[in-house]
Amino acid sequence: MPAHMLQEISSSYTTTTTITEPPSGNLQNGREKMKKVPLYLEEDIRPEMREDIHDPSYQDEEGPPPKLEYVWRNIILMALLHVGALYGITLIPSSKVYTLLWGIFYYLISALGITAGAHRLWSHRTYKARLPLRIFLIIANTMAFQNDVYEWARDHRAHHKFSETHADPHNSRRGFFFSHVGWLLVRKHPAVKEKGGKLDMSDLKAEKLVMFQRRYYKPGLLLMCFILPTLVPWYCWGETFLHSLFVSTFLRYTLVLNATWLVNSAAHLYGYRPYDKNIQSRENILVSLGAVGEGFHNYHHAFPYDYSASEYRWHINFTTFFIDCMAALGLAYDRKKVSKAAVLARIKRTGDGSHKSS
C-alpha cells in the first residue's frame, strides 16, 4: 500500500472521509517511502489521533508473569449475575410479550452505547456526533454498565496499541477465559497500568459530557442499568417484579456483557484473517450478530479509523446502519471510510488469502 493517502472531504456535514491512493505520479515516490515508513504509521487518516494505532516496537519483558491477584468481589458478583441470568432464561416462557420486546429494545440501545458510542466515536474518533446524538450515546452507554466511557476508551486504546502483550488489558494470548471475562476478575497487569496511564486521553478529558458521566457514573448506572429496566415492565404493563428483574435486567445485562466480551475472546481466536495474517484478530460472523456489527475484527484492527469497523458497511452491522441513519438526520458527520483500493492493497500485502478477491 502506498505510504501516503489523501483525504477527500466535502463541505457537507454528512460526508464520508475516504482514504484514497495517491495520484499516479507519486507512486514511485510512495514506494520509496514505503521502505522507510513502518506499517503501523502508513494508514491513519486522523493525524490528531494515534493512541489506538498498534505499536509493534513494544514487546513484553522476559520472565514469568506476576502472580494473579483475584478480585473476589468481582468474582462473586459476576457469578451471582450469571446465576440470575440462567434463572431468567427459565422465566422467558411465562413472561409477557411486552417484557421480551422491552428486553430486546434495551439490549440494542445499550449495545449501541458501547459500539457506536464508547467504541467507534470516543475510543477511535471514526466519526463526529452533534450534541443530541452524544447525549443519547452517553445515556445508552450508561445503560450498558461496562465502565464509563473514559475508562472504556483508555482500556480499548491500550488494547489496540499494545495488542496481545501484557499491556493489553484482555490479552488473548492468555487464553479464551482470560480475554473473555477473566481480566475483569483479577488485578490489572502492571504493564496495563503503566502503559495505559501514559496514553494521551486529553480529547476525552476536554469533553464535558464524558467527564460528567464519569463524575456521576455510579448513580447513573444504578438507575439506567438496573432500576429503570426493572420498573418499566412492572409498572407499565403489570409484569411481575420477578420477571422484570430477572428477564429485563439480569438476563438482558448478561447477554450484552457477553456479546461485548466475545469480541475480545472469540474474535481474537476463531476465524479468518483476510486483511492481516500477522495479527491475532479474526473475522467472526457470529460475534457480529451478537455485538451488532463488531465481529469483523481483523478488518477493524487493520483499519481502526474506519467508522464501519468493516469493509461491507451494513452487512451484519447494525451499528453502521445506525450511524448512517444519524448522518442522514444531520446528527453524525465526518464518517471516515477506507477506500476499496486501500483495502485491496492491504489484502494483497498482508492477507491470509481467504478474502474473496484473493
From Swiss-Prot:
Biased amino acid composition, Low complexity: 8-24
Protein's name in the database: Acyl-CoA desaturase 1
Record's miscellaneous remark: Desaturase has a half-life of only 4 hours.
Induction record: Up-regulated in liver in the absence of dietary unsaturated fatty acids. Expression in adipose tissue seems to be constitutive.
Domain notes: The histidine box domains are involved in binding the catalytic metal ions.
The record's free-text note on cofactor binding: Expected to bind 2 Fe(2+) ions per subunit.
Topological domains, Cytoplasmic: 1-71, 118-216, 263-358
Consequence when changing H166A: No effect on enzyme activity
Major location category of this protein: endoplasmic reticulum
GO molecular function: iron ion binding; metal ion binding; oxidoreductase activity; palmitoyl-CoA 9-desaturase activity; stearoyl-CoA 9-desaturase activity
Gene name as annotated: Scd1
Side Lumenal, residues: 93-96, 237-240
GO cellular component: endoplasmic reticulum membrane; membrane
UniProt record, GO biological process: brown fat cell differentiation; defense response to Gram-positive bacterium; fatty acid biosynthetic process; lipid biosynthetic process; lipid homeostasis; monounsaturated fatty acid biosynthetic process; positive regulation of cold-induced thermogenesis; response to bacterium
Positions of short motif Histidine box-3: 297-301
Positions of transmembrane segments: 72-92, 97-117, 217-236, 241-262
Cofactors named for this entry: Fe(2+)
Organism in which the protein naturally occurs: Rattus norvegicus
Motif range (Histidine box-2): 156-160
Compartment(s) where it occurs, according to its Swiss-Prot or TrEMBL record: Endoplasmic reticulum membrane; Membrane
